[in-house]
């Protein structure tokens, strides 16, 4: 199964890639109304992209299937040491605040999210004062 998770944002003046590279199969967007575009492959419409799907991508919010988020890049092992926990936490918190959790599961036990949730300001920690004050409010 292939999952389409990119956001389908292309400028209106996108070049004709079939003409440029000499073969078909390129995806293009036809901006046909405010906040919507038709996604075309070889001139045939296969999906309408609505503005509300741009941030996360088209398929995850339209399809009945779930979305699994898993970061990957192995240079210096940073992803395993700090990247996966931090990036997974950032993704989890952004999606939680955006109300997008109906069909999503995160890798690595949610990264460091379970351990940092107490520091995330959602009417918690030092709210409404800046984090890290020795005596909050003074």
From Swiss-Prot:
InterPro entries: ACMSD, Metal_Hydrolase. Substrate binds at residue 47. Belongs to the metallo-dependent hydrolases superfamily. ACMSD family. The gene is ACMSD. It comes from the Eukaryota. It comes from Sus scrofa (Pig). Monomer. Zn(2+) binds at residues 6, 8, 70, 126. GO terms for cellular component: cytosol. Keywords: Decarboxylase, Lyase, Metal-binding, Zinc. Pathway: Secondary metabolite metabolism; quinolate metabolism. The lineage of its organism: Eukaryota, Metazoa, Chordata, Craniata, Vertebrata. This is 2-amino-3-carboxymuconate-6-semialdehyde decarboxylase. Converts alpha-amino-beta-carboxymuconate-epsilon-semialdehyde (ACMS) to alpha-aminomuconate semialdehyde (AMS). ACMS can be converted non-enzymatically to quinolate (QA), a key precursor of NAD, and a potent endogenous excitotoxin of neuronal cells which is implicated in the pathogenesis of various neurodegenerative disorders. In the presence of ACMSD, ACMS is converted to AMS, a benign catabolite. ACMSD ultimately controls the metabolic fate of tryptophan catabolism along the kynurenine pathway. It catalyses: 2-amino-3-carboxymuconate 6-semialdehyde + H(+) = 2-aminomuconate 6-semialdehyde + CO2.
């Amino acid at each position: 199964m292939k999952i389409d998770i990119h956001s389908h944002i292309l400028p209106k003046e996108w070049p004709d890639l079939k003409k440029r590279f000499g073969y078909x199969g390129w995806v293009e967007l036809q901006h046909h109304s405010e906040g919507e575009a038709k996604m075309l492959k070889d001139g045939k419409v296969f999906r309408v992209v609505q503005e509300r799907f741009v941030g996360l991508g088209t398929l995850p919010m339209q399809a009945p299937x779930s979305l699994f988020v898993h970061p990957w890049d192995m240079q210096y092992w940073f992803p395993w040491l700090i990247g996966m926990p931090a990036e997974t936490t950032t993704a989890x918190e952004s999606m939680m605040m955006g109300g997008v959790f109906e069909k999503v599961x995160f890798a690595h036990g949610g990264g460091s999210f379970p351990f940092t949730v107490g520091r995330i300001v959602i009417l918690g920690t030092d709210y409404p004062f800046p984090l890290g004050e020795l005596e909050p409010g003074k």
